[in-house]
């Protein structure tokens, strides 16, 4: 599959990545049909997020279709259209160190 990827400071690229697999019973795999790049991704591009290392996929605001689910997943099923809330945080600032992510 292809994914928009942080390559190095100042550079994103569309790269080939392995297709994800279910690892845990609570996992779900979503085929992304639309994603956006927001200010969080731009902070990554400019090197302002220490935990963002080259190779991570960006574009965490997305919608898609559920492809598969683990045995403990009960709220969605394959074929459902979903939006994904992926919280990102730096882990370094006052708020993150106090457990208040996404502030």
Task: Describe the residue ranges of each PLM region.
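Extreme N-terminal starter segment of soluble prokaryotic enzymes
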Residues: 1-2
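Short hydrophobic/aromatic patches on the structural cores and recognition surfaces of FHA
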Residues: 17, 41, 64
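Cytochrome P450 core scaffold surrounding the K-helix E-X-X-R motif
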Residues: 40-46
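Short glycine/threonine/proline-enriched tight-turn/helix- or strand-capping micro-motif at secondary-structure
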Residues: 10-19
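Glycine-rich beta-strand-centered segment in the early N-terminal region that forms part
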Residues: 20-35, 48-97, 102
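Short polar catalytic/cofactor-binding loops
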Residues: 9-11, 35-37
């Amino acid at each position: 599959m292809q994914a928009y990827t942080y390559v190095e400071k100042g550079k994103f690229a569309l790269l080939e990545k392995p297709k994800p697999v279910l690892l845990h019973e609570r996992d779900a795999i979503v085929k992304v049909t639309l994603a956006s790049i927001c200010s969080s991704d731009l902070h990554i591009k400019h090197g302002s997020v220490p935990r963002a290392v080259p190779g991570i996929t960006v574009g965490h605001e997305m919608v898609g279709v559920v492809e598969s689910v683990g045995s403990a997943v009960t709220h969605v099923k394959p074929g459902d259209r979903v939006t994904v809330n992926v919280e990102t945080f730096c882990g370094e600032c006052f708020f993150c160190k106090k457990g208040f992510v996404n502030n």
